[in-house]
Amino acid sequence: MSRRGTAEEKTAKSDPIYRNRLVNMLVNRILKHGKKSLAYQILYRAVKKIQQKTETNPLSVLRQAIRGVTPDIAVKARRVGGSTHQVPIEIGSTQGKALAIRWLLAASRKRPGRNMAFKLSSELVDAAKGSGDAIRKKEETHRMAEANRAFAHFR
């Protein structure tokens, strides 16, 4: 048993313009090679494009997209008796949001398009509407968990 106490969970800081933690989480995942100002630029341009496309509050579109992509359950590989089973496990809200953000960014990077801001805005709008690669990834994960429901007792 470890003598150390449990680590405190850090809360995400909010970004300077929108004062939103979700925006900051997204910026930190867009970030490459420590270029945070570029990550902010990409996200703010994407938010502007969302504003132009939907003519609604872009933060509500962002929230709706992340809520739509957030998985409730996922599968985890568990080795039992020489064979590996995909065991369905429930996911907490923080981990679910992190997964959703990761899937949204992966889907937008895969998209054909001019620049990252354009691709990200398109993916976020699609996810808010309930379509797109990120939504497909969530549904696929849920299907996998449902198919492997028999192994839930290995948790």
From Swiss-Prot:
Annotated PROSITE patterns: RIBOSOMAL_S7 (PS00052)
Top-level taxon: Eukaryota
Pfam annotation, one family: Ribosomal_S7
Keyword Nucleotide-binding: no
Keywords: Chloroplast, Plastid, Ribonucleoprotein, Ribosomal protein, RNA-binding, rRNA-binding
GO molecular function: rRNA binding; structural constituent of ribosome
Subcellular location: Plastid, Chloroplast
One GO process term, biological-process aspect: translation
GO annotations of cellular component type: chloroplast; small ribosomal subunit
Family: Belongs to the universal ribosomal protein uS7 family.
Subunit structure: Part of the 30S ribosomal subunit.
PANTHER family: RIBOSOMAL PROTEIN S7 (PTHR11205)
Function summary: One of the primary rRNA binding proteins, it binds directly to 16S rRNA where it nucleates assembly of the head domain of the 30S subunit.
Protein name as it appears in the record: Small ribosomal subunit protein uS7c
Species the sequence originates in: Cornus mas
